[in-house]
């Protein structure tokens, strides 16, 4: 048995080294894989004409998968990283740091690019501050204490993400920092028509006993 297992691993490692052996696909919605599995089981196990529902269900799951949209904007749960979807892929606000989060985002987008490559897609900004316009909102990522301290413009259409806790009121804009994000978790923005919809990790997981979310969600 040991020889057989070693042979399997050897062949797997050899094939995995081929160029193009590893591919990426965008993460499907939670509905897709159950539909695909049930459809396949229905096709295999059912007898008679009703087994045709199996391929129909499988085809429907692939159609849903193809039409799924990834979030236009992703905010890391501690404010350390911001990702904005562009025509060339997701632009990340940092070329290094928060590597685990960056890798998960890119893999779920179906993008094999390195973090340093996707960071080069970012448009405007300066050292310590990255700016991106998404719909009616201007997203500002402040990286480090110096950037947070020097930031002095805050407008109602801005959403500011700080990598460190803010110690002052920026004014008439929405601010997310490690303190507020502890109450919401990571945040994703979707566009439904002209309307922006923000979905938090807390919205998805719910307030369960084991989730350990704070009892209230303070806002700034």
PLM-predicted stretches and their roles:
Residues 85-220:
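Extracytosolic and intramembrane catalytic regions of membrane-associated proteins
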């Amino acid at each position: 048995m040991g020889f057989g297992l070693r042979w399997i691993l050897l062949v797997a490692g050899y094939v995995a080294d081929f160029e193009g052996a590893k591919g990426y696909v965008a993460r499907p919605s939670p509905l897709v894989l159950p539909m695909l599995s049930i459809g396949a089981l229905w096709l295999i196990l059912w007898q008679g004409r009703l087994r045709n529902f199996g391929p129909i269900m499988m085809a429907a799951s692939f159609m849903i998968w193809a039409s799924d949209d990834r979030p236009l904007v992703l905010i890391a749960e501690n404010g350390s990283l911001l990702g904005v979807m562009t025509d060339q892929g997701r632009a990340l606000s940092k070329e290094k740091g928060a590597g685990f989060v960056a890798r998960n985002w890119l893999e779920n987008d179906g993008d094999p690019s390195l973090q340093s490559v996707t960071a080069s897609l970012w448009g405007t900004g300066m050292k310590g501050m990255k700016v991106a316009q998404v719909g009616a909102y201007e997203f500002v990522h402040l990286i480090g204490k110096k950037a947070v301290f020097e930031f002095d413009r805050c407008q109602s259409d801005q959403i500011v993400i700080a990598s460190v806790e803010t110690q002052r009121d920026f004014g008439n804009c929405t601010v997310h920092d490690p303190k507020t994000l502890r109450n919401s978790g990571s945040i994703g923005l979707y566009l439904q028509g002209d309307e922006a919809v923000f979905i938090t990790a807390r919205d998805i997981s719910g307030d369960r006993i084991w989730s350990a979310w704070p009892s209230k969600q303070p806002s700034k």
